């Protein structure tokens, strides 16, 4: 089972790496340094946990590989943008990410800020180019934008920043992690299903329960 999972995981990661390279602007296209920073942030690193969740649930619902690859790429761009901004001196002030200098160290703070902004925008360009049902497209937009906003990743990061020097309760800590990390993990699960169809109420409840458990497991391991 472990071996078959590893094979599947490597297959998805390889597929996604190619798709991301294709969907990101070329380094040779003006503004070159911005595009270089975007590609630096996204390519050749990371476990691709969120795209794997898109593919796992999407496969269960019979989604096309081409649609899952597009949706998963949008999710990974949102994740990469959040890491760029989180690493900056005004946030967590990290100098290393995935064993290499963070984007603001490599390209400067201003270019890092722009690269993050551009990746967030590019994610929705990618999502808009999925050529299928219009209702599904709107649902996917709602899910991904909600996970990235003030009731998702941004909200979780705001709570994290506000908590510096304070003792958080278990409830506050859970809320921070649920928003900062769990929101995009949950979105990845839901977007996998929405790569194929709109889930039934029963399927929706099951997916949400699974996403909640997966998010908690991720936090424990992380």
Could you say what each language-model-derived stretch is?
Residues 14-15, 24-221:
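Mg2+-dependent prenyl diphosphate-binding active-site environment of isoprenoid biosynthetic enzymes
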Residues 1-24:
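N-terminal amphipathic/basic leader segments beginning at the initiator methionine
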């Amino acid at each position: 089972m472990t071996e078959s999972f590893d094979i599947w995981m490597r297959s998805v990661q390889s597929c996604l790496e190619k798709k991301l390279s294709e969907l990101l602007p070329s380094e040779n296209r003006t503004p070159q340094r911005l595009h270089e920073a975007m590609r630096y942030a996204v390519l050749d690193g990371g476990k691709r946990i969120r795209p794997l969740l898109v593919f796992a649930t999407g496969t269960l619902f019979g989604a096309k590989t081409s649609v899952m690859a597009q949706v998963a790429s949008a999710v990974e761009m949102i994740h990469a943008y959040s890491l760029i901004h989180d690493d900056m001196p005004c946030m967590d002030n990290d100098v290393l990410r995935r064993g290499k200098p963070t984007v603001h160290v490599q390209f400067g703070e201003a270019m890092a800020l722009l690269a993050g902004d551009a990746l967030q925008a590019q994610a929705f360009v990618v999502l808009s180019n999925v050529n299928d049902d219009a209702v599904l497209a709107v649902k996917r937009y709602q899910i991904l934008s909600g996970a990235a906003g003030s009731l998702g990743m941004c909200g979780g990061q705001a709570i994290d920043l506000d908590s510096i020097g304070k003792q958080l309760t278990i409830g506050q800590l859970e809320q921070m992690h649920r928003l900062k990390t769990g929101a995009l993990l949950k979105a990845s699960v839901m977007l996998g299903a929405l790569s194929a169809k709109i889930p039934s109420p029963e399927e929706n409840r099951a997916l949400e329960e699974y996403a909640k458990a997966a998010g908690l497991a991720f936090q424990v391991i992380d």
